[in-house]
Design a protein with these regions (language model features):
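Replication-associated primase and helicase/ATPase modules
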Residues: 1-5, 9, 20, 25-33, ...
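Short, well-structured beta-strand/strand-turn elements
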Residues: 4-16, 107-117
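Generic, ordered loop/turn and secondary-structure boundary motif
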Residues: 12-17, 100, 164
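Phosphate-handling DNA/RNA-contact segment within nucleic-acid enzymes
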Residues: 21-123, 137-138
Length: 174
């Protein structure tokens, strides 16, 4: 958490889980058929607008794959982080991962979901990861541009992958 320079105001919403798969199986029985290869993960809870946890993400600390595992406790809700803090009346930023969202004001993380919001597209800016050769990201960029949303286009010379990498490299918020 400290290495990634996560703002202190989020520390109380993040948790260490030494046995992630066992934790998941308690929260959502039979998610994992076994717990071989058990390892610790950072737990990032997803809260809805009523401050109720409806999903959580486990982020690996090492090279374990997948790096992110998101578990939905309510299958009817979109995998969106930040619903408990976003103000839909103000300009909204949408990034891919919860950690990236912690560095931007009024920000949501789509966490792999195709996010649908009932807000004016001109009031939203999508900030996809800087992966110009990733066909899935390029397709999603085109999709949101066609719907008249704002999209950040990274300069060709930027070698950093996402907002958190930029913060860790010494860049600051604008």
């Amino acid at each position: 958490v400290i290495k990634r320079k996560i703002p202190e105001k989020y520390f109380s919403k993040l948790f260490l889980c030494n046995k992630f798969m066992a934790f998941v199986n308690k929260a959502k029985p039979n998610t994992f058929s076994h717990t071989k290869g058990e390892h610790p993960r950072l737990i990032i809870p997803f809260y809805d607008i009523n401050d109720k946890v409806f999903a959580f993400q486990g982020r690996a600390f090492g090279k374990e794959q997948p790096k992110y595992l998101t578990v939905k406790l309510d299958e009817n809700k979109q995998k969106v982080y930040g619903l408990d803090t976003v103000n839909l009346q103000e300009h909204i930023h949408i990034v891919e991962g919860p950690i990236d969202s912690m560095f931007l004001n009024n920000c949501l993380a789509a966490a792999g979901a195709d996010l649908t919001l009932k807000v004016e597209p001109s009031n939203v800016t999508y900030i996809f990861d800087n992966e110009p050769r990733n066909k899935e990201i390029i397709k999603r960029m085109y999709d949101v541009i066609e719907k008249d949303y704002n999209v950040v286009i990274w300069p060709d010379n930027l070698q950093l992958k996402d907002v958190n990498d930029m913060i860790m490299s010494g860049m600051s918020k604008a």
